Amino acid sequence: MAMTDPLGDMLTRIRNGQQAKKDSVLSPASKLRAHVLEVLQREGYIRGFSEDTTGVHPQLRIELKYFEGQPAIKHVARVSKPGRRVYSGSKELPVIRNGLGITIVSTPKGVLSDAEARAANVGGEVLAEVF
């Protein structure tokens, strides 16, 4: 059966991996997933990621991050879903936890955090929220 929301699947794998205290999780590779992981790494929510091409299908190995035994990501949720896309202008981008969290946005300038999108004055599809 085909996967209807690949990005949502990756976020769920990250959430489940952190709840199970895993060091890393695997997710099928795609450009969008890699760009979202770059934002998470820049913002300090994951240690890093690498592409594993040893198998038939490329996989992304996501290195999870913990702080004093607690997951760095307390909450991760998909905002724009396949059945209901959510778009926002640069001035209307949601602020998560009074700026303590981030919103990941797909813009014409690439996948950015909400702060980067505001600084570049671009809006786009609101992919996920993380704190």
From Swiss-Prot:
SUPFAM superfamilies: Ribosomal protein S8 (SSF56047). InterPro entries: Ribosomal_uS8, Ribosomal_uS8_CS, Ribosomal_uS8_sf. GO terms for cellular component: ribonucleoprotein complex; ribosome. GO terms for molecular function: rRNA binding; structural constituent of ribosome. Part of the 30S ribosomal subunit. Contacts proteins S5 and S12. HAMAP family: Ribosomal_uS8_B. This is Small ribosomal subunit protein uS8. It comes from Novosphingobium aromaticivorans (strain ATCC 700278 / DSM 12444 / CCUG 56034 / CIP 105152 / NBRC 16084 / F199). The lineage of its organism: Bacteria, Pseudomonadati, Pseudomonadota, Alphaproteobacteria, Sphingomonadales.
